[in-house]
Regions:
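Macrodomain-like recognition of ADP-ribose-binding/processing modules
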Residues: 1-135
């Protein structure tokens, strides 16, 4: 995700994983827009939602400051720390994430992102799903 809020208060979830999440969770852009306005660009626990036949906890994971930017490794590090805190607080036993910051974020997973994530997401609760093509 990114920190951009539209004039109507909704977060911009226009492409990539953010758009996929928006399609699955009605009202996500409004809820996230409110959180961004109040607390800034950080990871947020967005509650439990039905995805297909499963109940799934949704956590945002900012990789960009603005949707036009490339992803930022320092922000990914900060988001990973926040994700780990959220996982502990809400007792999330398994967290699946795409190779964050890659694709539209223009980072290379093996050369850049993996090193950052491995510093923080250092136990088997966290699983990066490579080859992920969307929800």
């Amino acid at each position: 995700t990114n920190s951009v809020i539209r004039k109507n208060g909704d977060a911009v979830l226009g492409k990539g994983q953010a758009l996929e999440a928006k399609k699955l969770v009605p009202g996500l852009e409004h809820q996230l827009g409110e959180y961004l306005r109040r607390y800034g660009n950080r990871a947020f626990y967005m509650g439990v939602h039905r995805v297909g036949d499963r109940l799934t906890s949704l956590v945002t994971f900012p990789t960009k400051h603005h949707y036009r930017d490339n992803s930022d490794l320092d922000l990914i590090m900060r988001s990973a720390v926040q994700l780990k805190e959220i996982a502990a607080k809400f007792q999330l036993s398994k967290i699946y994430l795409p190779p964050v910051g890659c694709g539209l974020g223009k980072l290379d997973y093996e050369k850049q992102v993996r090193l950052v994530l491995n510093q923080v997401l250092d136990d088997d609760r966290f699983v990066v799903v490579l080859g992920y093509k969307g929800l």
